[in-house]
Swiss-Prot record:
Top enzyme category: ligase
Name of the coding gene: queC
Organism of this sequence: Yersinia pestis
Official protein name in the record: 7-cyano-7-deazaguanine synthase
Pathway: Purine metabolism; 7-cyano-7-deazaguanine biosynthesis
NCBIfam families in alphabetical order: 7-cyano-7-deazaguanine synthase QueC, PRK11106.1
Length: 232
């Protein structure tokens, strides 16, 4: 039996990964992390979506220690979430939570070991992203190797969106006939606003720009998507 664990926040990317995983695996387990994030309403959104989409199980794990250690505008109300800046100098944004994906993928692997899943699926990508070092393909592969050595079992880290831009991620949701669900019922906004979000933060900017690009050129974007990932 094919089983997978999806690292699930209830945002656009992880929900798209969940939708795809449900087509590819016999059992799909979701794991969501409560680290005291500013936009913690995402946890309720994740619960609703996991139930609505039919995940096999959904575990919400308290990892509050990350909030104590990682200083970020997503973990401290005293640090404002920055608006999108097209002229940013390339420095890490204040929304970066150091160690987040290291911790999440490690714990997801332990959960995968428990439920005998062969894969951990995460929605990180290197194309349209905010410059976070723990979203890079190089990092994911290195951590995957280390965890396999540490637990003595091969658990594949799957990154379906790694080389997709945001327009192609929207196209993937549309391919599975879930574009409206992704648009209106997921929470990607750093300020915790569901759907189209605040429209000001970097996450909302990337999401809106990708949607506009997809809607303006659907046929070409879908063709690009199919060529990249081998969809029929």
């Amino acid at each position: 039996m094919k089983r997978a664990v999806v690292v699930f926040s209830g945002g656009q990317d992880s929900t798209t990964c969940l939708i795809q995983a449900l087509q590819q695996y016999d059992e799909v387990h979701c794991i969501t992390f409560d680290y005291g994030q500013r936009h913690r309403t995402e946890i309720d959104v994740a619960r609703e979506l996991a139930l609505q989409l039919g995940a096999t199980a959904h575990k919400v794990l308290d990892v509050g220690m990350l909030n104590e250690l990682a200083v970020s505008s997503l973990t401290r109300d005293s640090i404002p979430v920055p608006s999108y800046d097209a002229n940013a100098d390339g420095a890490l944004p204040s929304t970066f939570v150091p160690g987040r994906n290291i911790l999440f993928l490690t714990l997801a692997s332990i959960y995968a070991y428990q439920v005998q899943a062969q894969a951990v699926i995460t929605g990180v990508c290197e194309t349209d992203f905010s410059g976070y070092p723990d979203c890079r393909d190089e990092f994911i592969k290195a951590l995957n190797h280390a965890i396999d050595l540490g637990i003595g079992r091969d658990i594949a880290f799957i990154t379906p969106l790694m080389w997709l831009d945001k327009a192609e991620t929207w196209a993937l949701a549309d391919y599975y006939q879930q574009l409206d669900l992704i648009r209106h019922h997921t929470l990607t906004c750093y300020n915790g606003i569901k759907g189209d979000g605040c429209g000001q933060c970097a996450a909302c900017h990337l999401r809106a720009k990708g949607l506009a690009s997809y809607m303006a050129n659907k046929q070409q974007v879908i063709l690009n998507l199919k060529q990249k990932v081998g969809l029929a």
